[in-house]
């Protein structure tokens, strides 16, 4: 039996609101028999009614009863398929948020013949019933999990179909390219070149560029989705842990005058300017014979490589120490595409002339026109300027642009597969391989892109993997 039909037989039910005690909970019922199974449990103005005749999308105040037991007073709303989230008949029951009440209503529904929904089953049905494509369905999970404005905006773009439109356009271009090449296979006896080779390669190049742009956006998209990784680095005792505590507004890291106090990385997140940042306080890098501290330093090096933004902290009162400047210079030289913000800490005791001199020294040492930010992590000075700089970095990164950003690891992998298939086709073209072999790679690229939106999905295992990560009531 086709996966499009085997999963949609039962009428399912689940709590659609978050677990725990609350003022209100919503229980969702969906399936062909939703109205028939809920009707015996619901009394409207003291009488049982046939919910199939209820006015769609109209709230009804009544009672949920089972075997003469009043379970709760509820607000019930009916949605007639296909005009519902799942495109099936749907009933939503808003009850009091008691754990007992939720459980009793679910028990009553199951006694009537409903089945408890699996994780993501409502959204899965919406996809299988054509209410949304697969990438939009995955966006639902991202919207639910979003913690910041940027995460929410990125997921909403995907849900509203812009992402799917871009992918479908790419797929159509690939189909056109394949069609032009396969014409020669259909008419081998004709000594005619159906497609100009130069035009074919130009079209292939255009598609590759579009794919690469989407692939390259994944680093930013993944960072926004999971929290932009920011490493706080510097030699020992420059105030890295104090800076983390000040940013977070709590004593997250131990602060001490003893060198090497931070022996492991400490991570925490906070929202700044609509973005979620994941700060990592690293152990101060220095030569040490302490085994535990050495392990912490190695982990710090790893976290620095993973970071998208580096906060390089120096102690403004000890700037003459060569190891401070040498260490920051090494980080600067190895930063690659990462953004580095230079922070001069303990600046509360520095005169204006000293600040100017320090700024010039650091700019000369790093061969950069970028000026450092002077802060006092202990007193909170300069922290607002730092937060503004972090926000500005993200604003100019493209995170808020209209361009689509890939944030889903599955999508990224499939886009890479499509890109690699096109590269193989291009290489085979240059080697003079036959048209039938070239079109195999094109078909692979088409399938990979189609799997993102669900147009090429044939495996139930793939759908199970995707929707198993949803919560029960979605």
UniProtKB/Swiss-Prot annotation:
**Required co-factor?**
K(+)
Enzyme class, top EC level, equals hydrolase
Q: Which UniProt keywords apply?
A: Cytoplasm, GTP-binding, Hydrolase, Magnesium, Metal-binding, Nucleotide-binding, Potassium, tRNA processing
Domain TrmE-type G residue range list = 227-395
Keyword Hydrolase in record: yes
Instruction: Recall the GO molecular function terms of this protein's record.
Output: GTP binding; GTPase activity; metal ion binding
**Which InterPro entries does the entry mention?**
G_TrmE, GTP-bd, GTP-bd_TrmE_N, GTPase_MnmE, MnmE_dom2, MnmE_helical, P-loop_NTPase, Small_GTP-bd
Provide the binding site for Mg(2+): 241, 262
Q: Does the keyword Cell inner membrane apply?
A: no
Indicate which residues the UniProt annotation says bind (6S)-5-formyl-5,6,7,8-tetrahydrofolate.
Answer: 28, 92, 131, 474
Give the cofactor note.
Binds 1 potassium ion per subunit.
User: Where found in the cell?
Assistant: Cytoplasm
HAMAP family per UniProt: GTPase_MnmE
Fill in the subunit field for this protein.
Homodimer. Heterotetramer of two MnmE and two MnmG subunits.
Task performed by this protein: Exhibits a very high intrinsic GTPase hydrolysis rate. Involved in the addition of a carboxymethylaminomethyl (cmnm) group at the wobble position (U34) of certain tRNAs, forming tRNA-cmnm(5)s(2)U34.
- What name appears for this protein in its UniProt entry? tRNA modification GTPase MnmE
- Organism field: Porphyromonas gingivalis (strain ATCC BAA-308 / W83)
């Amino acid at each position: 039996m086709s996966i499009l039909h085997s999963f949609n037989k039962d009428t399912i039910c689940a709590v659609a609101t978050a677990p725990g005690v609350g003022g209100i909970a919503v229980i969702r019922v969906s399936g062909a028999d939703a109205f028939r199974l809920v009707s015996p449990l619901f009394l409207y103005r003291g009488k049982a009614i046939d919910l199939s005749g209820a006015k769609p999308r109209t709230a009804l105040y009544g009672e949920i009863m089972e075997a003469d037991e009043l379970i709760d007073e509820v607000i019930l709303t009916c949605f007639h398929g296909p005009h519902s989230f799942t495109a099936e008949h749907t009933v939503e029951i808003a009850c009091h948020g008691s754990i007992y009440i939720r459980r009793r209503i679910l028990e009553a529904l199951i006694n009537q013949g409903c089945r408890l929904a699996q994780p993501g089953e409502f959204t899965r049905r919406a996809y299988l019933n054509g209410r949304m494509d697969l990438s939009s369905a995955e966006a639902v999970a991202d919207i639910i999990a979003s913690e910041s404005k940027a995460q929410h905006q990125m997921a909403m773009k995907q849900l509203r179909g812009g992402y799917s439109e871009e992918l479908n356009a790419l797929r159509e271009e690939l189909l056109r390219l394949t069609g032009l090449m396969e014409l020669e296979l259909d008419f081998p006896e004709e000594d005619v070149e159906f497609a100009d080779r130069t035009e074919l390669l130009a079209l292939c190049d255009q598609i590759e560029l579009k794919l690469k742009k989407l692939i390259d956006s994944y680093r930013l998209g993944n960072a926004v989705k999971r929290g932009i990784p920011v490493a706080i680095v510097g030699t020992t005792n420059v105030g890295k842990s104090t800076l983390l505590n000040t940013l977070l507004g709590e004593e997250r890291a131990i602060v001490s005058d003893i060198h090497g106090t931070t022996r492991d990385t400490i991570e925490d997140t906070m929202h700044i300017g609509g973005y979620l940042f994941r700060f990592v306080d690293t152990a101060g890098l220095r030569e040490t014979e302490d085994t535990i501290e050495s392990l912490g330093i190695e982990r710090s090096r790893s976290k620095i490589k993973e970071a998208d933004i580096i906060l390089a902290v120096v102690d403004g009162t000890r700037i003459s120490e060569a190891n401070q400047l040498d260490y920051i210079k090494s980080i600067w030289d190895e930063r690659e595409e990462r953004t580095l913000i230079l922070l001069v800490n303990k600046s509360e005791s520095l005169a204006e002339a000293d600040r100017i001199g320090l700024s010039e020294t650091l700019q000369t040492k790093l061969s950069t026109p970028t000026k450092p930010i002077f802060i006092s992590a202990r007193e909170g000075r300069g922290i607002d300027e730092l937060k503004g700089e972090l926000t500005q970095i993200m604003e100019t990164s493209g995170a808020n642009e209209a361009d689509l950003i890939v944030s889903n690891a599955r999508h990224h992998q499939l886009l890479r597969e499509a890109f690699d298939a096109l590269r193989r086709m291009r290489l085979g073209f240059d080697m003079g391989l036959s048209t039938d072999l070239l079109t195999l790679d094109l078909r692979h690229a088409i399938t990979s892109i189609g799997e993102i939106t669900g147009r090429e999905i044939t495996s139930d295992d793939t759908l199970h993997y995707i929707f198993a990560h949803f919560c029960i009531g979605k």
